[in-house]
Regions:
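Catalytic cores of nucleic-acid editing and processing enzymes
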Residues: 1-324
Length: 324
């Protein structure tokens, strides 16, 4: 998981501000909800290490670069990023280990072609087994509701087409939906305007049900994320926080929170007692739909999903850097 530095590092020197490839630009930042301060991490020599990673990606044409060519998995081909799926973010974190040596960690954002774990890349923050169990529990119900809604859409459209073809018959219809003698009518028994109204009500109820279930499922998934902090490790408390503890009260947790490169890289460093020295992220593959991400370009950590998390994670890093 830890790779050696590819940049030239003369004996007795460090990949710090004295190195000619050092970039002082702040690429990773966040506001800590615990101490109320913004914490940052510069690119350092991570951009130079990213350039080396880009060359490796071009050379191998796949992300499972540790596998021999005859054992390469087509699932991990970079062709995936140049097709319908479009590109993806990759990141490199330069670290100092407990024994004083230096190395790099690598990450890709979220999943790669629906796979969370790939050899040579840091793991996700989420418990995958628990995630799979939650998805297996909720998705079939959510999908079934979606199918029923689509069926109702088709039925409603057909009813409206039929109604437009027989306007006189509809205008002459005065039968009530409920009578004292017969009770509630079924959808099939009701006149056309009433049938459409009943179908629309059923559809609205199903939409609300699906929305509620989707929200509960997403909250349950977000509860599976546990975020560590350099401060907690330094204080030997090692207590992980949930996403709901980190994000401001009343603010929803955006979809995909915790899956970006920076949180994955920092989490691995925290859990393995490594000290970050620089972090950089770049986009690889087909341009994003919005045009905001372009192949081979560097981008800072995102504001919406990462800013609160990174502030919490980086809190305490300054003290660790001072104490070595």
């Amino acid at each position: 998981m830890l790779f050696p530095l590819t940049i030239d590092l003369p004996h007795g020197t460090a990949p710090d501000a004295s190195h000619p490839l050092y970039d002082a630009a702040v690429t990773t930042r966040g506001l800590c909800p615990s101490c109320g301060r913004e914490h940052t991490l510069p690119a350092g020599v991570a951009r130079a290490e990213c350039a080396s990673l880009m060359r490796l990606l071009e050379q191998h044409g796949r992300i499972d670069m540790q596998a021999p060519d005859d054992a390469a998995d087509p699932h991990f081909s970079l062709d995936y990023l140049h097709g319908v799926a479009r590109g993806q973010m990759f990141g490199v974190l330069v670290v100092r280990t407990q024994d004083g040596s230096y190395g790099t960690l690598r990450a890709f954002s979220a999943q790669y072609n629906r796979v969370w774990h790939v050899a040579g890349w840091v793991p996700p923050l989420i418990d995958i087994a628990a995630f799979d169990a939650q998805v297996a529990k909720d998705d079939p119900v959510i999908n079934a509701l979606g199918r029923r809604i689509r069926e109702l859409d088709a039925t409603i459209a057909a009813e409206r087409d039929a109604a437009e073809q027989t306007p006189q018959a509809i205008s002459d219809t005065t039968a009530p939906v409920v009578t004292a003698d017969t009770g509630p009518m079924s959808v099939d028994e009701a006149p056309a305007p009433t049938r459409i109204d009943l179908l629309m009500r059923e559809r609205a109820a199903l939409v609300d049900e699906r929305k509620g279930l989707s929200q509960r499922s997403m909250r349950a998934i977000h509860e599976l994320y546990r975020v560590h902090s350099f401060g907690n490790r330094t204080d030997r408390a090692d207590r992980a926080a949930s996403l709901f503890e980190i994000f401001p009260a009343g603010r929803g947790v955006p979809t995909g929170t915790g899956d970006c490169c920076a949180p994955k890289l920092l989490q691995y460093a925290i859990l393995h007692n490594m000290t970050p020295l620089g972090l950089a992220e770049f986009y690889w593959g087909r341009e994003s739909r919005s045009g905001a991400r372009r192949h081979g370009e560097f981008y800072p950590s995102c504001q919406d999903k990462c800013y609160p998390i990174l502030g919490y994670m980086l809190c305490g890093l300054e003290e660790r850097a001072v104490t070595g």
